[in-house]
Design a protein with these regions (language model features):
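Glycine-centered positions in the ABC transporter ATPase nucleotide-binding domain
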Residues: 1, 17-19, 43, 73, ...
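Short loop/beta submotifs within extracellular cysteine-rich repeat domains
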Residues: 2, 7-8, 22, 75-78, ...
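Tandem-repeat/low-complexity and Cys-motif detector
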Residues: 11, 36-39, 59-62, 83-85, ...
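Short, exposed beta-strand/loop patches in secreted or surface proteins that constitute
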Residues: 12, 37-38, 86, 110-111, ...
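GD-rich hexapeptide-repeat beta-solenoids
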Residues: 21-59, 73
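Extracellular beta-strand/loop-rich repeat segments of large surface/secreted proteins
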Residues: 46-53, 63-71, 79, 83-85, ...
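Outer-membrane translocation/initiation segment of Type V secreted surface proteins
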Residues: 178-293
């Protein structure tokens, strides 16, 4: 427990016991890992680094507080608390990822600021792994922010429920959104157009009027299977719409007879690929390099 003028500055923390921060000293670290207990006692912990740092915390958030992520780091939170706030901005990446025991994460307020990336990521890539469900009081997607929804396309019903539920959602002008899949996903099997798939839901939505839509970026298998992805407001829901990709997207890269045959083989097999097969591995490698509008 650090009280008085004691504090933390410029270190990576692996927390497997209990850390209480209640003093007036600086509370700034490069990354947070472990499965212990963090008690901020109403204060703010800054997670920031000028170099690439990765942290993953799955412990307990005790009391009240705020965690603020910035810089070049990648901070994963596999736990939550309805009395904690989150912020990400200034180059930082915040990954919210549930577990099989707790696929839903709760937070009080979340702010995704300029040059910050929020990633809501499924708990895994296997058939029995669900998407992460984020529940918050409020979330503010500010101008210049990026939010990525990472689905497990191996799940039996990957689009069956919203990935974000909030009391209020604010979408700033210039906020960006994108869709991605988990590494290890190799296909969707049978699939149709995405038509009114609920992505987010809230009692109050500001920044997106009824019926208004905005484009959503795609990467990986979403770019393979779909085109013209958008999200629009329908009442208290923000829903996804996208059209099935009919044309072989690998064709523009063909520069020989062999590569042409390979592109046709991969395209025709895209609905039923074993992750351990050579085609499955090829699809994984190629799809991770694909982005779409």
């Amino acid at each position: 427990s650090l009280t008085g003028k004691a504090g933390l500055s410029g270190t990576s923390v692996t927390l497997n016991g209990t850390l209480g921060l209640s003093g007036t000293g600086e509370k700034s670290i490069q990354s947070l890992s472990g499965s212990g207990t963090l008690a901020l006692n109403g204060g703010t912990l800054s997670v920031t680094s000028a170099s690439a740092r990765n942290g993953s915390f799955s412990g307990t958030l005790d009391g009240e507080g705020r965690i603020d992520v910035s810089g070049s780091g990648n901070q994963v939170m596999q736990t939550g608390s309805s009395t904690y706030d989150l912020g990400v901005h200034g180059g930082g990446t915040l990954v919210l990822k549930g577990t099989s025991a707790a696929p839903a994460l709760d937070y009080r307020n979340v702010a995704v600021g300029s040059a910050g990336t929020l990633r809501i990521e499924a708990i895994g890539h296997d058939a029995g792994d669900s998407n992460t469900s984020l529940n918050v009081g409020s979330i503010d997607f500010q101008s210049g922010s990026t939010t990525e929804f990472v689905y497990n396309l191996s799940a039996s019903d990957p689009f069956g429920s919203a990935m974000l539920t909030a009391d209020s959602i604010t979408i700033g002008n210039g906020a960006g959104f994108s869709l991605a899949n988990m590494e290890g996903n190799t296909g969707l099997g049978t699939y149709d157009n995405l038509d009114g798939v609920v992505l987010m839901t809230a009692d109050t939505i500001d920044g997106l009027t009824e019926g208004e839509s905005m484009s959503v970026g795609t990467s990986g298998l979403f770019a393979v299977y779909y085109k013209d992805a958008t999200m629009s407001r329908e009442g208290n829901h923000i829903v996804l719409n996208a059209t099935v990709q009919q044309d072989n997207i690998f064709t523009p890269a063909v520069n020989s007879h062999n590569s042409g045959a390979g592109s046709e083989l991969l395209w025709e097999a895209k609905n039923n690929l074993d992750a351990t097969s050579q085609l499955g591995q090829a699809m994984h490698s190629i799809s991770t390099m694909i982005t779409g509008d």
